[in-house]
Amino acid sequence: MKYYVVLDTNVVVSALFNISSVPGIILHEALAGRVIPLLHEDILDKYNDVLHRPKFKFDRRDIEIALTGLIKRGIFLDAATIEDYVPDPDDAIFYEVVMEARETTDAYLVTGNIKHFPVKPYVVTPKEMLEILNENER
């Protein structure tokens, strides 16, 4: 079974800090093709901006591998017009893309900052997404 996900930037950052962490496992699943990343140019811009911040000290090669893999495996979508309130306007693009995807398929927004998004069953933490993946393996 394929899962369609929008990965919030904080999930990608956490994954690069520790590939063995739950966010790291989610990123690995995306790069392996079990999880299909849902993308938008604005999301890629955010990934690029945040991952290249000097404070994180990520190896450029690791960033390139992650972003190239997400692009290769991902699907680019338009952003839906939303009526739900998203407290941080910078995060709206993640919610807009998941809402666009949900018009045609089940899709999840995976974030470490649940409070930044409307309370919906498809807005999940990395741990919840991993539970969904493992549950449906059985």
What are these regions (language model features)?
Residues 6-7, 17, 22-52:
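PIN/NYN-family metal-dependent endoribonuclease catalytic core
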Residues 56-57:
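Membrane interface segments of multi-pass transport proteins and intramembrane proteases
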